[in-house]
Swiss-Prot record:
Highest taxon listed in the record's lineage: Bacteria
Organism: Escherichia coli
Key words of the record: Transposable element
Species classification: Bacteria, Pseudomonadati, Pseudomonadota, Gammaproteobacteria, Enterobacterales
Record-given protein name: Protein ORFh in retron Ec67
Length: 104
């Protein structure tokens, strides 16, 4: 645990990481807090308005788009593991299952 990245980094805010946070997870989590509006994934650039509650939808969209285009890979599986959901917003079971089905 010599790195700055640790489970303690998952501080109490409105986001929940569904898996034990690793360095990649916390980097994504920190970006949410910076309200970053451009996501880079491979050669694709995804933009979204700086609307805090909608940030997790960008990750959903990336995951679903990758699935639909048949580009799911081990690297993407890593990304899917770190999806972030606001506590107040119920997860869409259909969307979640779609991601799981594509990754499995």
């Amino acid at each position: 645990m010599g790195s700055a990245c640790s489970a303690e980094s998952a501080h109490s805010c409105q986001h929940v990481l569904p898996v034990a946070p690793g360095c990649g997870a916390m980097r994504m989590h920190d970006r949410l807090h910076q309200n970053v509006d451009v996501w880079k994934l491979g050669n694709q650039t995804w933009s979204t308005p700086l609307m805090y509650p909608k940030m997790e939808l960008v990750e959903y969209n990336i995951a679903i788009s990758k699935c639909i285009n048949g580009k799911s890979s081990k690297v993407d599986h890593h990304l899917f593991s770190f999806l972030v959901f606001p506590k107040a917003m119920p997860r869409d079971a259909t969307v979640s299952q779609h991601i799981v089905n594509c990754v499995d």
